[in-house]
């Protein structure tokens, strides 16, 4: 079976041998050649590891995949897609992924202690509000995390676990057990939209959640994928229908309240391999970010065909994107 490495999520793990060796593990979202076109393949999630964050060795079999199990009705024939993984302080890994049966995408959750053997728990909104959101299309989850020394771990806020999620808008959900989640609603009993697409900006079509959100001194940082709309409603500085990466900051006391948002992307398709493949309009689709060896490694999908990495060194920042430097100019 031919696999195309696609989108990834990452996590750190320490391994004791003759000394402590820090390994970087990634979960690779791969698609086979059973179908033609985006959305018609069968997706599986694999496992790879690295000692430098750049060169990876992966095992030959998937670790999370559509099987003959309790989730078959949600995952056959489309599979398991778009993984986002984080870890609790006691070492339990939690993965949120899209269960795709080619009819309706649903956010699913699974847990593991070794990143290899996963226990599926099913759709995360199945029990919420008596199943109100069970048959609604849901995907793309970014759980709230914090830094514990140099390790990024799942965090609570106001006594609850917090999750940003959504593709067309950014929504939120809370949980007490990491498995059963309750969407945050507005006073009218509908999903509360935290941020939405903006006319004339790089995220004019979609604002899709990406890696786990991170508590910082200034607020909660959520990096997300923005899709540029074609025509007059999009940002003419970027290709129509292209995917770029944005940032939004939420209030620490009220995690549903945005307090700052970039008007231009901090990562955009520029290289040839980011503009060729299954999605030729240009795609840098971020899904995994980790603090590794005192640097931030951001892993992203290149045109739905390859996996790339961008590295930020806080001690030696690189040159800013010229679009950001000139962001005050007319569009």
Functional labels for PLM-detected ranges:
Residues 81:
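Acidic-residue sensor for enzyme active/binding pockets
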Residues 203-209, 282-285:
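Donor nucleotide-activated moiety binding/catalytic core segment of transferases
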Residues 212:
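Active-site/ligand-binding surface loops and adjacent short beta/alpha elements
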Residues 274-276, 284-287:
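Short glycine-rich, acidic/polar surface loops and turns
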Residues 1-15, 19-78, 87-205, 215-279, ...:
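Beta-rich carbohydrate-recognition and catalytic domains
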């Amino acid at each position: 079976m031919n696999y195309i490495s696609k989108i990834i999520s990452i996590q750190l793990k320490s391994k004791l041998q003759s000394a402590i060796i820090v390994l970087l593990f990634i979960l690779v979202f791969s698609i086979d050649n059973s179908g033609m076109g985006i959305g018609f393949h069968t997706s599986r999630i694999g496992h790879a590891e690295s000692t430098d964050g750049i060169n990876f060795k992966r095992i030959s079999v998937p670790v999370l995949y559509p099987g003959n199990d309790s989730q078959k009705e949600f995952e056959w024939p489309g599979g398991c897609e778009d993984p986002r993984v984080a870890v609790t302080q006691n070492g339990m890994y939690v993965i949120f992924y899209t269960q795709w049966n080619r009819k309706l995408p649903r956010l699913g959750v699974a847990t593991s202690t070794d990143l290899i053997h996963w226990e599926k728990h099913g759709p995360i909104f199945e029990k919420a509000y008596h199943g109100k959101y069970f048959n609604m299309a849901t995907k793309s989850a970014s759980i709230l995390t914090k830094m514990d020394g140099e390790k990024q771990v799942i965090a609570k806020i106001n006594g609850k676990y917090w999750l940003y999620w959504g593709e067309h808008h950014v929504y939120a959900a809370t949980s007490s057990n990491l498995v059963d989640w309750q969407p945050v609603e507005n006073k009218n009993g509908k999903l509360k939209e935290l941020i939405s697409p903006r006319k004339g900006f790089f995220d004019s079509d979609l604002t899709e959640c990406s890696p786990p959100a991170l508590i910082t001194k200034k607020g909660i940082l959520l990096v997300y994928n923005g899709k540029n709309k074609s025509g007059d409603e999009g940002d003419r500085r970027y290709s129509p229908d292209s995917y770029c990466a944005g940032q939004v900051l939420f209030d620490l006391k009220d995690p549903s309240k945005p307090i700052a948002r970039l008007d231009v992307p901090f990562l955009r398709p520029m290289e040839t391999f980011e503009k060729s493949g299954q999605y030729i309009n240009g795609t840098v689709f971020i899904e995994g970010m980790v603090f590794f060896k005192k640097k931030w490694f951001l892993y992203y999908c290149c045109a739905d065909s390859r996996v790339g990495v961008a590295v930020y060194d806080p001690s030696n920042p690189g040159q800013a994107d010229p679009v950001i430097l000139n962001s005050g100019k007319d569009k």
